[in-house]
From Swiss-Prot:
Cofactor: Mg(2+); Mn(2+); Cu(2+); [4Fe-4S] cluster
Organism: Methanocaldococcus jannaschii (strain ATCC 43067 / DSM 2661 / JAL-1 / JCM 10045 / NBRC 100440) (Methanococcus jannaschii)
Ligand binding (Mn(2+)): 49, 68, 80
Role noted for this protein: CRISPR (clustered regularly interspaced short palindromic repeat) is an adaptive immune system that provides protection against mobile genetic elements (viruses, transposable elements and conjugative plasmids). CRISPR clusters contain sequences complementary to antecedent mobile elements and target invading nucleic acids. CRISPR clusters are transcribed and processed into CRISPR RNA (crRNA). This protein may be a 5' to 3' ssDNA exonuclease.
Superkingdom of the source species: Archaea
Residues the record lists as binding [4Fe-4S] cluster: 22, 159, 162, 168
EC assignment: 3.1.12.1
Class of the enzyme per the UniProt entry, highest EC level: hydrolase
Name of the featured protein: CRISPR-associated exonuclease Cas4
UniProt keyword list: 4Fe-4S, Antiviral defense, Exonuclease, Hydrolase, Iron, Iron-sulfur, Manganese, Metal-binding, Nuclease
Catalyzed reactions per annotation: exonucleolytic cleavage in the 5'- to 3'-direction to yield nucleoside 3'-phosphates
Coiled-coil portions: none
GO biological process, one term: defense response to virus
Amino acid sequence: MENYLEEELIIGGIEINYLYVCKTKLWYFVRGITMEQESDFVDLGKFLHEKSYFGEEKEVQIGSIKIDFIKKRDVIEIHEVKRGKQMEKAHIMQVLYYIYYLNSLGIKSKAILHYPKLKEIKEIELKENNKEEIKRAIKEIEYIKSLKEPPEPIYQKICKNCAYYELCFI
């Protein structure tokens, strides 16, 4: 695998997630404008994360990524706990980035998404086509970071519950 750790992989998983949720939110976030502390949905997600999967070491930081918890098996299992599947594409891309990142360090891994409220889990493995999408996502994040103004927000159903709603639409 090509080594992209020089600068491309200083991106965090939340940035990958936000790219697939909302590019405007990503732009605010990378500038340190964080509104999540105002969100009841973020609080609910933190509660689920803290109360789920007892006995697991939580929030494992490896370089620029922060994983909910890991298990050591034949490969490293990356575990992410999510509240619901409404933004499943963003969740999948986030954990694919984690796998990609760890692979660049020579660490074999796979990911497991947990949806405790739905009592579902989803196993994710990095495929060749995913690597290309991750590379494109990294380039797009770098482009969004370079913008002097936020991208024009595109209203979605999720916007009404977003912590950044007022910055975008009021």
